[in-house]
Structure formats: C-alpha cells, structure tokens
Regions:
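Conserved "HGTGT" condensation-loop signature of ketosynthase/thiolase-family condensing enzymes
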Residues: 1-144, 182, 191-211, 217-301
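Short, conserved alpha-helix that lines the donor NDP-sugar binding/gating region
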Residues: 158, 162
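Short conserved active-site loop signatures built around small residues
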Residues: 154
C-alpha cells in the first residue's frame, strides 16, 4: 500500500532565515536557496576548549522546554493545516516523534543555580517521554509515540507510522522530527571522532566527519497516492560490531526497501546517502551502493 505525503513543514539552517516553511502536496517542489555556511559551537573536552562548525537554526543558543514545545506545536498544526485536515485532527491523529535531543537542553540549563523550568519539570525524572506527555495533555491525543535511535530516530518514526497506516489502525499520521543543540549530543559525537573540525563536508572522499545542526520537520501522511508518494520502507540492525558497519547489512536494507516498493534498482533516480564522514561507515555504505546502485546519482546532505 502506498502512502501519500499530503503536507510537510521544514525549519533548518538552510531554510530562509531559519524560519519554518509549510507546504502541501499541491505546492510543487520545496523552494531552493543558496546554501548557508555553518556557524560554530564550542565545548570543553578533556580539559581543552574546542570550537567546531555547527548549523544553528533557532534563535536561542539553548532552547528552553517551553520554547521547544511551542516550535514543535507550530510544526504539527501547520502540517495538519496544509494537509487540509479538520481542526480536530491534532487530537485524533497518531503522532510519531523522532529525536535524540528531546528536552536535553532544558535539563542542562536546570543544572545552573537559580534556573527555574517554565513547564515545571520534575528534576528527579529524566524521561524521553516528556514531549509526548506534553502533547497528550495539550492536544488531548492519546496516541503519541517516541523514537530515540540516534541518527535513525525520525526515519524509524516514519517507518512505524507507515506500518500503522498500512495495517488500517489509523487513517492519518503525523511524523515529527527535531534536533536542537545540547552539549551531551555534541560532546558524544565528538568523543567518537565523528564531527568535522572544518566547514568542509566531503563524505566518501575525505572522511573528516560530519557537521551537526538543528532542525525540525513534520510530515502529514495518508493512505493512497499523491504528488509525493512513499512507496517502500525498510529497517535493519547491523550486528557486526559497535563501531563498524557491515556493507552486506546496508545492502540488505536497500534491497528490502526496493522489494517493499515493488521497484527495481534501475528505477531509482537519486540516493540520499547517510554519509556520516567516518572511514569505516562510509566505506561500507559506498560498497553497498556500488553493488546495488552503481550508476545512481547520490546526494549527501
């Protein structure tokens, strides 16, 4: 069963002035803008002060929980509005949330003396479900699901939304993905040697790492066909090791997605690569792409 993308919102460093853009499936392609160069963020690592490139999107250096939740609400409401859904859809449409950040920036600010949470967070309860709980009460929506699987969080949220739609458990779905700056994620990726230390991002050629950034986006999905149609999904877990990637596992996931879409490799016109910029991961991904889609153009964003 195909899934139509009825509307979408996007807010990132590459959108004009970091503002949210909302568009429906009848609006055509997302407007292109001149690429924005990354800014910088600093961290203290093993007694050293380190500055790395970073794509800032939101006005505040660290979003409070209240500010973040308001931004996410705007994405949900605008996606539903652009999809021409009824006003009550935010209360009865399942919402699938993918992120690694959640309210981490708020938690970090709460360590500062005198900082008071605007939404009254329980300082003894560090849960990823606070965002879901907030929208459960704000929207009166019981069907809100959270996904935190590192770089694949929003992709997994999208896959499970598609599975629920195909199973007939719902008629519509909203998929919300977001990332905002927090020191834990920034320092974690740096400690793993995954972050670039220069503004140049050249995966598959110079494996110097990738550039982190902030963003938020939301998709409004329905069963059927549309101007933009999601035809196939697939997911998998690479069990080769904690720090290495198996090219065979990457190839199997792509083959599964093609099978789910009833498509042949020759029909694929573009691959948006993972392209994380680490030598082992890029080598495995490149090998899988060469084996399955040797002549298909690739884009790393």
């Amino acid at each position: 069963m195909n899934i139509a993308i009825r509307a979408a919102t996007l807010q990132c460093a590459q959108s004009r002035n970091g503002q949210m853009h909302a568009f429906s499936d009848s609006d055509g392609l997302y407007p292109l803008h001149a690429p924005a160069a990354p800014a910088e963020r600093s961290l203290a690592f093993l007694g050293r002060h380190i500055t790395l490139p970073y794509f800032n999107t939101f006005a505040a250096a660290k979003l409070s929980a209240a500010d973040l939740l308001d931004i996410l609400y705007q994405h949900l409401s605008q996606a539903a509005l652009q999809a021409d859904w009824p006003s009550e859809s935010l209360a009865n449409t399942p919402i699938f949330i993918g992120s690694t950040a959640y309210l981490m920036s708020e938690r970090e600010q709460m360590l500062n003396p005198g900082y008071v949470s605007e939404i009254g967070l329980d300082t003894g309860r560090h849960s990823l479900t606070h965002v879901a709980e907030h929208f459960h009460h704000r929207l009166g929506n019981p069907d809100i699901f959270s996904f935190a699987t590192s770089c694949t969080s929003s992709a997994n949220a999208l896959c499970y939304a598609v599975k629920m739609l195909r199973a007939g458990w719902c008629q519509r779905a909203l998929v919300l993905g977001f990332e905002n700056f927090n020191a834990l994620t920034f320092e974690h990726f740096h400690a793993m040697g995954l972050l670039a230390d220069t503004p140049a991002y050249t995966p598959f050629t110079q494996t110097g790492g990738f550039i982190c950034g902030e963003a938020a986006a939301c998709l409004a999905l329905e069963c059927g066909n549309g101007a933009a149609t999601l035809r196939g999904i697939a997911g998998g877990t690479d069990t080769l090791g904690l720090t290495h990637t198996d090219s065979a596992a990457v190839k199997r996931v792509m083959q599964a997605a093609l099978s789910d879409a009833a498509a042949q490799p020759g029909q694929i016109r573009l691959v948006k690569t993972h392209g994380i910029g680490s030598a082992a991961a890029d080598e495995a991904e490149a090998a899988a792409l060469h084996a399955l889609l040797p002549n298909t153009p690739r884009a790393a964003l």
